[in-house]
């Protein structure tokens, strides 16, 4: 009887290990779409990995990207990757500007440091400039509400407080209904940092990393 119980226990442990092994690939595959689109022998973009290392403050980055068309990629660190949206009109400090944000594939955390030119023939070929970067806080958490960034993302309503070089204050990403699965709206929320009198894209075109503009980066 004792031997039978020991065997049963061993089988349970083995089944548990197999189950854990089966579940693990789903987590490892989060960046599969990102990697499958790129030839890392030709592009300097980081191959990257999921990075769930606990940081004191989560990061964000906005990268100006002149690919098939000019746009701004807004990326938020959530669950070890950069959740990403392409914003054709870019960010604004005016709360009345509701800009389309098209969700794209998850990027590795290392991508927040990437600035350079993606070679011709590669996915997203063209110059990429770090337009702004910094840290952010979960606005709901700041208000004392118990809802995680991952849950806000799943619910299609993200509210964050950005602390960047150019952008500061509360911003929202809201998933739209009836406009397509990957379409969101990105906008400045009303607070003391809102400013409807300026066009931040035109007044601050330079990279916060190198000081270059998208045109000078292309020439280099």
State where each predicted segment sits.
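N-terminal secretory signal peptides that target proteins for export/translocation
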Residues: 1-3
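A charge-rich, low-complexity, intrinsically flexible signal that marks solvent-exposed coils, linkers
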Residues: 22-220
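Hydrophobic alpha-helical membrane-insertion segments, chiefly the h-region
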Residues: 14-22
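Sec-dependent signal peptide hydrophobic core
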Residues: 5-13
């Amino acid at each position: 009887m004792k031997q039978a119980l020991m065997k049963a226990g061993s089988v349970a442990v083995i089944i548990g290990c197999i189950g854990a092994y089966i579940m693990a690939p789903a987590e490892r595959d989060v960046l599969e779409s990102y990697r499958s689109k790129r030839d890392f022998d030709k592009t300097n973009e980081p191959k990257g990995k999921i990075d769930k290392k606990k940081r004191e403050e989560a990061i964000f980055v906005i990268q100006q990207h002149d690919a098939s068309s000019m746009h701004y990629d807004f990326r938020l660190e959530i669950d070890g990757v950069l959740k990403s949206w392409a914003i054709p009109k870019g960010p604004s400090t005016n709360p009345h500007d509701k800009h389309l944000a098209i969700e794209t594939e998850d990027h590795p955390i290392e991508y927040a440091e990437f600035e350079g030119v993606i070679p011709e023939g590669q996915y997203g070929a063209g110059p990429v400039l770090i337009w702004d970067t910094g840290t952010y806080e979960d606005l709901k958490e700041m208000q004392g509400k118990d809802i995680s960034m991952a849950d806000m993302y799943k619910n299609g309503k993200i509210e964050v407080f950005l602390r960047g070089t150019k952008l500061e204050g509360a911003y929202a990403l809201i998933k739209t209904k009836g406009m397509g699965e990957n379409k969101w709206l990105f906008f400045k929320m009303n607070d003391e940092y809102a400013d409807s009198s300026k066009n931040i894209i035109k007044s601050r075109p330079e990279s916060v990393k190198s000081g270059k503009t998208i045109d000078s980066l292309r020439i280099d």
